[in-house]
C-alpha cells in the first residue's frame, strides 16, 4: 500500500523554529526522525548549532538539543554536518536523547557554480567514522549527505553487516 511511512525533519538548528516544526510533524501521528545540524567553533573548543557563515549562531548546540529532545520523536541524530563535527555533536546528543540515533554527514564541499562536490572524506574514511559512531554512540541509522557518492555507500554495504543482529 502506498503512503508516507515516516517524517524526517532536517537541519534543526534554531530552537524556536525547531519546536514549531517538530510539534507539527509529531501531530501527524507518523514516526518522526529529527536531524540536528552542528558545527564546531573556529577554535574547535565548542559545538554550535549550524549557522550560515555570514550570521551568528542563534544558540549553542547543547542548549538546542536540551530544549528540543523533550518534545519526543522516534529517532534523533546529526546530519548535514562535517564529518569531523559529527562525533562531538553526537556526544552532546547522547546526554539528552536515549532513543535510536542517526548520523549522516557531508563527505564533500560544494564547488559553485555547477553543484559539483570536492571530496573531503574518502569512502574508506567515512566508513571508519560511521563504525566509530556505531561503537561509541550507539548510532543505528546511517547514510550520507552532501557529497556522498555510490562508492561511499558501497563500502558501507560491505562493512556494516557485522553490526546487524544475528
Per-region residue spans from a language model:
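Domain-level signal for soluble alpha/beta catalytic cores
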Residues: 1-166
Amino acid at each position: 500500500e502506498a503512503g508516507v511511512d515516516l517524517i524526517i525533519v532536517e537541519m534543526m538548528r534554531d530552537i524556536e523554529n525547531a519546536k514549531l516544526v517538530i510539534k507539527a510533524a509529531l501531530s501527524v501521528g507518523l514516526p518522526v526522525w529529527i536531524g540536528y545540524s552542528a558545527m564546531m567553533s573556529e577554535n574547535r573548543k565548542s559545538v554550535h548549532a549550524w549557522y550560515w557563515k555570514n550570521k551568528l549562531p542563534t544558540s549553542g548546540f547543547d542548549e538546542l538539543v536540551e530544549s528540543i529532545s523533550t518534545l519526543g520523536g522516534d529517532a534523533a541524530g546529526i546530519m548535514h554536518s562535517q564529518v569531523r563535527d559529527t562525533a562531538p555533536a553526537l556526544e552532546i546528543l547522547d546526554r539528552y536523547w536515549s532513543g535510536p540515533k542517526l548520523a549522516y554527514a557531508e563527505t564533500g564541499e560544494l564547488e559553485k557554480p555547477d553543484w559539483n562536490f570536492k571530496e573531503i572524506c574518502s569512502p574508506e574514511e567515512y566508513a571508519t567514522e560511521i563504525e566509530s559512531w556505531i561503537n561509541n554512540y550507539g548510532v543505528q541509522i546511517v547514510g550520507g549527505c552532501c557529497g556522498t557518492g555510490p562508492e561511499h555507500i558501497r563500502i558501507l554495504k560491505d562493512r556494516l553487516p557485522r553490526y546487524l543482529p544475528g
